[in-house]
Regions:
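Active-site helical microenvironments for divalent-metal-assisted chemistry
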Residues: 37-268
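Classical Sec-dependent N-terminal signal peptides that target proteins to the secretory pathway
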Residues: 1-23
């Protein structure tokens, strides 16, 4: 068993508590033995997680941010399964299937940041925000977050998602997908107009998505984005999230804090 996965599982077994996105779990790599893990979590489930992580590691070319996001997602998932009993074994396997599906679909795509981070880091990060900050434990919401850009940005049909993950997940993905046949400015305008009509699940995914993108702009913006363009994105993002129906107070506050911090940093 690799050390990172042992750390993830140990954190889930020992604490079951969410940590700050950048905080390392304060547990020893040896705080849970393999036999204890096998008894409490299931040996085959561990093997499935390791297989998914290996696939991701290969396609993401061992990108640090991507692998950290996966490990954080697994920490939250295993805590929900083992400690909270809020996710079933089948739910964990479905989340792993979602990671694998999204990883393959986004293979070769990168973010617009200067480091050209593998794109899969984004849906993983959105799912982590839902679980860590939003305390979301609904498996369909988590999987829809993992797949939220597959229809919009890859050659994926909703029917394919429905066949593998069900109509609920496909419906949520449809709700949060833009029509890429429209010009970018029109898509942004429609996001503002349509925000108030989103379901609570779609609203939560939108909040986590915007939170990830806003933080990414602060920490690793595209090289060709001017300060004015970043300002405009923050203004537009606020227009969208302010119109979303109430859905998750923790995520709403996190997005607002991010926006407020940005404008405070821009003050003369």
């Amino acid at each position: 068993m690799n050390n990172l996965l042992t750390l993830v599982i140990s954190a889930a077994l020992v604490s079951g508590a969410a940590t700050a996105p950048n905080a390392r779990p304060k547990v020893s790599l040896h705080s849970a033995t393999k036999s204890e893990i096998a008894e409490d979590i299931n040996e085959q489930l561990i093997a499935d997680i390791e297989e998914c992580r290996t696939e991701l590691d290969q396609l993401a070319q061992n990108n640090t941010l991507t692998m950290k996001s996966f490990d954080n997602l697994m920490k939250e998932t295993l805590a929900a399964y083992h400690k909270e009993k809020s996710l079933s074994k089948e739910d964990v396997l479905t989340i792993l299937d979602g990671v694998s599906f999204a990883t393959k679909k986004h293979d070769g795509q990168t973010r617009k940041n200067t480091e050209k981070t593998p794109y899969i880091s984004h849906p993983l990060g959105v799912a982590v925000h839902l679980m860590e900050i939003g305390k979301v434990r609904d498996v369909n919401t988590i999987v829809a977050a993992l797949l939220h850009d597959t229809v919009e940005d890859t050659k994926t049909e909703l029917a394919e998602i429905e066949k593998q993950f069900g109509s609920a997940v496909a419906g949520y993905v449809k709700e949060v997908s833009d029509n890429k046949s429209l010009p970018a400015q029109e898509r942004k305008r429609l996001q503002v107009i349509n925000a108030s009509h989103k379901s609570a699940v779609a609203a939560q995914i939108k909040l986590a998505d915007k939170l990830y993108n806003l933080n990414d702009l602060l920490n690793n913006p595209p090289s060709d984005w001017t300060p004015t363009r970043i300002d405009q994105y923050f203004q537009w993002a606020k227009s969208v999230v302010d119109r979303l129906p109430p859905s998750n107070e923790n995520l709403e506050l996190a997005v607002q804090d991010c926006i407020d911090s940005y404008w405070a940093s821009q003050a003369p």
